[in-house]
Amino acid sequence: MSLWKKISLGVLIFILLLLATVGFLVGTTTGLHLVFSAANRWVPGLEIGQVTGGWRDLSLKNIRYDQPGVAVNAGEVHLAVGLECLWKSSLCVNDLSLKDINVVIDSKKMPPGEQVEEEEESGPLNLSTPYPVTLSRVALENINVKIDDTTVSVMDFTSGLNWQEKNLTLKPTALQGLLIALPKVAEVAQEEVVEPKIQNPQPDEKPLGETLQDLFSKPVLPEMTDVHLPLNLNIEEFKGEQLRLTGDTDLTVFSLLLKVSSIDGNMKLDALDIDSSQGAVNATGTAQLANNWPVDITLNSTLNVEPLKGEKIKLKVGGALREQLEVGVNLSGPLDVNLRAQARLAEAGLPLNLEVVSEQISWPFTGDRQFQADNTRLKLTGKMTDYTLSMRTAVKGQDVPPATITLDAKGNEQQINLDKLTVAALEGKTELKALVDWRQAISWRGELTLDGINTAKEVPDWPSKLNGLIKTRGSLYGGSWQMEVPELKLTGNVKQNKVNVNGSLKGNSYMQWTIPGLHLVLGPNSADVKGELGVKDLNLDATIDAPGLDNALPGLGGTAKGLVKVRGTVDAPQLLADITARGLRWQELSIAQVRVDGDIKSTDQIAGKLDVRVERISQPDVNINLVTLHAKGSEKQHELQLRIQGEPVSGQLDLAGSFDREEMRWKGTLSNTRFRTPVGPWSQTRAIALDYRGQEQKISIGPHCWTNPNAELCVPQTIDAGAEGRAVVNLNRFDLAMLKPFMPETTQASGVFSGKADVAWDTTKEGLPQGNVTLSGRSVKVTQTVNDAPLPLAFDTLNVSADLHDNRAELGWQIRLSNNGQLDGQVQVTDPQGRRNLGGNVSIRNLNLAMVNPIFARGEKAAGLLNANLRLGGDVQSPQMFGQLQLNGVDIDGNFMPFDMQPSQLAMNFNGTRSTLTGVVRTQQGEINLSGDADWSQIENWRARIAAKGSRVRITVPPMVRLDVSPDVVFEATPSLFTLDGRVDVPWARIVVHELPESAVGVSSDEVMLNNQLQPEEPQTAAIPINSNLIVHVGNNVRMDAFGLRARLTGDLKVAQDKQGLGLNGQINIPEGRFHAYGQDLLVRKGELLFSGPPDQPILNIEAIRNPEATEDDVIAGVRVTGSADEPKAEIFSDPAMSQQEALSYLLRGQGLDSNQSDSAAMTSMLIGLGVAQSGQVVGKIGETFGVSNLALDTQGVGDSSQVVVSGYVLPGLQVKYGVGIFDSLATLTLRYRLMPKLYLEAVSGVDQALDLLYQFEF
């Protein structure tokens, strides 16, 4: 064999072995595991915990990769490849999932990378695959990536795709729980204050007019060619839930839906639905990236941000980008505006038609309107090189008089000419004509005219009539400006005072001002300003002569006269002032006299003197007799004295110091300082040393103390305050008696507090100040008067502390109540400026409810122990709580309780963002079981539920109501709605109403409630609406005794409440009953109360008949009441039917009109019955005076057997009844004694004698 053949054979064998090795390593499970094992060993920083399966089901677990600046931890990676697809020349991946991935990248620790040279563009990019690629499932679960200060977290993501040639289809995709936390923008350091410098014009600066001319000389939209996308993309459905972006702004997207496709440059948006914390967006549309680039987009949005909450936006974009683009915007809600625009972006000059229309615009958008513009029309037509602008509107507001505004203007890219801007208001008009030009410098020329302005109707307390003319011109170029007012005229009168303003002035940015003369006259008062302020020389005089300021302006009064002169140069100015004012008044403030006398010069040093004297300052709650300020000296040595005499504050201080201009340093002392205040006198114990260093922007305050008879506040060491510093303040003593002037009469406090504050800061570094504050109380006692009874609360220990260190804020407290329990706790907030994570605990031990017993009446009490052990977690946006709160042995006995409560329990268990409630309320008869839960995982959409279920719980409201109730109700609460559903059964009840209180009167329909300022109060409505759907079932053993009616009630009522108010639906029946009135004994034969709406407007259907046993001739006579409770209709009926007179006779007398009984006897019986019925309340009052309870006067019997009966209780269990016949004068004496609650012994003495034993039954 030749050498060539041997070499060829060797090469062939090597290639075959290499291919076989690669095939073994890649194509077999064993080989694949060997590859990962080698990578685990040889790749620096890579660690793979477990490898299972092959290509069809490959799983990698516990993967770690560490490199400088990069740390990757992967819990599980799964890959499933469909190898059978390879035979069909396609690539199929059945599953690619990543779980529990954590990536941390710190770019500062990464080595610098090599700079990559940018590749030159090689023409349009086309992406295409020669073989179909199918990715059936892609899944991400619990992915966390942190790059420097940016964090991205994904809770769950599933998707899939198909890629064939240029067509890429994204299968239905779901994304849940995305969080992108961006770093907040660092606060810009405070800039140092520097002297203003005048910026001179730059000759090479391009004028604005030339810039705009170049911009509009060619189309705004550049020449556009057809765009060919490298792929045809089809997103079938992309759904997202709970997507959140945090940082400087916090945005939460509750749901997202996207359907979009792009084929050969034809874009189609089938759906874009976004529901976020800031609003909702729905959009559809089409666009073509070729030819004229036609577009058709429709967008609807609802905003959820203040002040435009609830604003609806409709946007329509049509036309073509390269021809005419049409835009329509409709805003409705707090702001109602319609906008229509047509623009040709591809033409030079930018042809544009714009129209804005609004029927009404108000500010603020919600709440009370302070400003309103009606019928606003704005129109712009033409090109930017030649356009016409017009605007019309009518405005009004709280501080704005009604006015009509019109504007007509023309302009181009170099100037705008305001032909007329007219404001018609106050019975006159104001016109502005102006020309603004920016071809070279920005210059203007304008003329403002006031014609016939009259404020008499708008401000009747300050009527004025004004006319005037103001002309102005000026220019601005390169940061330098100049302005001139060649004519200023204003004439008229203000409240019978002549007004005259006349003058002219001019100035520039070099602070050169020339005032030839400025004269102001208001009635007898005048002021004049004349002079120059040049670059160096100063020569300005200002005089004021105001002998009659009374009523010159509303609330102004007094006299003033003075002179101010400015002389010298800018480097060495001199100020001379001599001003005197007497009897000054402004609104409720009055000053008897003000005198200012000063002479200040500035050469190499500022020196001079200034004296200010103010006498008798008075306004509500303030009465200052004298204030004097005296300052004199120079920079090197100066002093200031301030004296105040009056109420509520008086005192004095002395300040002396020196200033070194070279070092920009001032040093001084504050001494002889004391003040008298409503909380007592304050004074210094030593002079305060002050040192201000201007170059360092720092001030030092020496140690000192402030003392008060009830307090002492000390600074034990020097405070250096500047960009950084530290301050320590000790509160050695603070007696709560100081707070008495500020506390209501119903609150009293005593005790002493002491504390300390130590705070350090450094504004040159990011973060919050560092420090701590402690406060400790001794013998602290607070007494609050409740219901005219004192409620004392004494503390054995009362400590509060606050700490801020290492980017963590903490608040702690320790409270020990005298002869009671204790409350301890601490709350921590980590990273207060960032994530604001919560931590801490709250503990309550053996807190006894008996501490409120002092406010209860005699015989009333409260008992029970409150214990809690709670732990805080989560963050401020999503707080969490863990632990339990228990209330055991709760027993509240009081007249205000509707039931006799027995020891009961209540417990709440907290588990993160959820809690549960269990409890039982025990009574002497029956118990109520409580259960419930709450959820605040979404703090803005919290939810709470409480259910109550009981059986025959006795409710007593003495002395009128006793009933048994069996509730089965559920109360649910959300931020937007309260609901109450369920059923309440009343199987047994006794309702007794003897009489209404004398003071009980109905509320007038025109009642008006006034507040403390005697202004009508607005009716208060519930912040959260209440909906109820409650059924009340009245059982067969419910009886009522009220106003002579004794009856049994049955029926069902449905209690419903919504935004319209409370309503009742249902029927109450009276199957049996008796009604005693006007001496007659009526039986309820039929009784129905129909409810359908407001509870006080039932429909009545009641029939009451006279007792047939007391009616002759077997006649049934009665009264029928029908109609509504507001307008009932009563009629008399009889059976058999007869005339109204005959029926009335049977109803009142029990006999017909043709009866043989004497009419006088019958009439006597009837009148006595009517009179006795009306005298019940008077007789009852007489009985109470003589110690007889329930004394009553009534009639009994019919016809000749009629009697007048007096009855009453002379002892709690002994009733005496005495009756005398009306016609036979026979007397009957009855004694009834109660042996047991329902067992009576009765003795009757009259014509006959009897002794009876009676027992009362209830059915």
From Swiss-Prot:
Its main location: membrane. Residues 1-6 are cytoplasmic. It is found in: Cell inner membrane. The keyword Membrane applies. Disruption phenotype: 50-fold reduction in ability to colonize mice in competitive assays with wild-type. Pfam families: TamB (PF04357). GO terms for biological process: protein secretion. Disulfide bonds: none annotated. The chain crosses the membrane at residues 7-27. It is a single-pass membrane protein. InterPro entries: TamB. Keywords: Cell inner membrane, Cell membrane, Membrane, Signal-anchor, Transmembrane, Transmembrane helix, Virulence. One of its GO terms (cellular component) is TAM protein secretion complex. Residues 28-1259 are periplasmic. Belongs to the TamB family. Interacts with TamA to form the translocation and assembly module (TAM). Component of the translocation and assembly module (TAM), which facilitates the insertion and assembly of specific beta-barrel proteins into the outer membrane. Promotes the secretion across the outer membrane of autotransporters such as p1121. In addition, is involved in outer membrane lipid homeostasis. Likely transports phospholipids between the inner membrane and the outer membrane. This is Translocation and assembly module subunit TamB. It comes from Citrobacter rodentium (strain ICC168). The gene is tamB.
